[in-house]
Amino acid sequence: MMKKRASHHLVICTLIDTLRFRLSSRKAISMNAFNKLVKHSKKISNFNHLSSIVGWDQAAVMPSGGAEARSQAMAELSVHIHGLMTQPQLADWFAEAESETLNIEQQATLREMKRQWQQATVLPEALVEAQSLAGSKCEHAWRSQRKNNDWAGFEKNWAEVVTLSQEEAQIRAEATGKTPYDAMLELYEPGTTTEQLNRVFSDVKTWLPSLIDVVIEKQSSESFIAPKGHYPAESQKALGLDVMKLLQFDFNHGRLDESVHPFCGGVPSDVRITTRYNESEFVQSLMGIVHETGHARYEQGLPKHLAGTPAGEARSMGIHESQSLFFEMQVGRSPAFIAHLAELAGKHFSAMNDPVFRVENIQKLYTRVQKDFIRVDADELTYPAHVILRFEIERDLMNGKIKHTDVPELWDQKMQAYLGLSTKGNDQNGCMQDIHWTDGSFGYFPSYTLGAMYAAQFMAAMKKTVDVDGAIRSGDLSPIFSWLSENIWSKGSLFSTDELVKQATGETLNPEHFKAHLSQRYLK
C-alpha cells in the first residue's frame, strides 16, 4: 500500500515537473520580445503580400467597373495593416528586445522593424484610410484623364491627395525634427536629406545640359534606321520573355503582364512585372522589360531566411533602382548585350535581313540622345534632367512653398530651362505623365538618379574582378549576377545604404562614376 502511494506520488511529481518545464519553456519563448516582434512582422508581411498582389491586379487586369469596390477593399486592408503596425504592446516589445542578447542579423532586424514601426505610429488611422481612398480614386481617374489631357478633372482629385500628403509630411516632420520633404524622403531613402540631394543635383546641373548638347551635335551626323511597320504585341511579349530568360529571371516565382504604366510589384516569391506595347515599334517595351527584370531579380535574390522581416527587404528605392538601371543601362545598352537583342528581335519578327535589326543600328537606337517630354521613354543622358525637375517641384510642394495649382506652370518653366521644351497646354506629357504623384508617393523621384549613380559605381567595382563583357558575349551572365547577389541582393537591409555601397565598392556614393560612364559611352 505504501509502495503504491509512493509510486503514485512519484508519477504525480514527474507530471508536475514536466508541466512546469513546458510552462517555463513557453514562458521563456513568450517572454522573448524579439521573437514576438519577428512573428508579428511576418503577420504584417502576409497582409502586405495580399495588398501588393491586389495592387498588381488593379493595374494589370481589373475591369474599370471594379474600381470603386476595389478602392474600398484596399482602404480597409490598409487600415488593418496600419492597425497591426501600431498595436500598443509593440512599444513594450521593442523596449524589452533592446535589452536582449541578439546577434548581428537580429540587431539589424530589430533596427529595421523599429524604424518601420516608428514611421507607422506617427500617422492616425483616419489619415491612412483617407489617403488610400483618395489615392485609389485619383490614380484610377488619372488613367483616362491623362489620355484626354484633362488637367481640370485631374486637379480636383489630386488636390485632396496633395493636401493629405502635406498633412502626412508635417506630422512626420514634427515627429522626427526633419523638414516635411526630408521626412517623406526617409520613407524611400533612409538617411538621405534634401541638403545632400541639392548638392548632388546642383553639381549635375553644371555639366549635364552642355553634355547633352555636345552629344546631340555629335550624333546629328550619324544615320540610323527607325523601326517602321507592324510589331505585334504577342511577338513583342515572346521576345521579352526570351530576354528575361537570358537575364535568368525565375519564372517559377514571377510573371510578365501588361499595364498602362510599367512597374514591378508582387513579392519576392511571386514577382509581377509589367510593360506596355506599341505595335508601331518594339524598342521601348523591350528595354522596359529589361529594366523591370532588374527590379525583379533583386526581389528574387533577397535573403530568404529573413523573408517576412524588414531586414529581408530591399535596402532603399535608390538601391532598387540601381538594380533596374544596372540591367537596363549598364548591361542592357552595352554592345555585347545589344548583339543578343538584335539576334532575338530579328528572329521574333521574322526579319533577320531587315537593316533595322543590325547590331550597329540597334546600338544607335538605344544610345540615341534627344530632348523629349516623357520620362519613362527618356534616354540615359536626359533622364536625370527629368528627375531633377520632379525633385525640385515635389520638394517645394511638400515644404509648402508652392501650391498644387502652380505645378503645370512650374513644370513648363523647368522643362524649358533644362531641356528646351515647353509643356504649356500639354499636361498629359507634362505634370500628368507619372503615376507616382497620383497616390501621394512624394519623395520617390530622386531614387531614379541615385540609382543610376549607384549602378555606374557598382559596374566600376565589378569590372575589377569580373570579365563583364566576356560574360555578356557568352550568353551566360552568371558571373555578373553572382557579384550582385553576393554584394547587394543577399544583404537585404542588414546594412545602411552607405554601408552597403561602401562594402561593395570601397566608397560611399561617388557621382563621378556616373559622369565618367556617360562620357565614356557618349563621347568616345
Name each model feature, range by range.
Residues Q131-F282:
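Contiguous, non-catalytic segments that form substrate-binding/exosite surfaces or channel walls
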Residues S30-P190, S519, L523:
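A well-structured
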Residues Q284-Q300, E321-L325:
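Active-site recognition of the HExxH zinc-binding catalytic motif
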Residues A33, S52-G55, G65, A69, ...:
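C-terminal, non-catalytic "cap/extension" segments appended to globular domains
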Residues T18-S30:
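Short, Lys/Arg-enriched N-terminal segments with co-localized hydrophobic residues
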Residues E313-N353:
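Post-HExxH zinc-binding segment in Zn-dependent metallohydrolases
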Residues K3-K4:
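Polybasic, lysine-rich low-complexity intrinsically disordered segments
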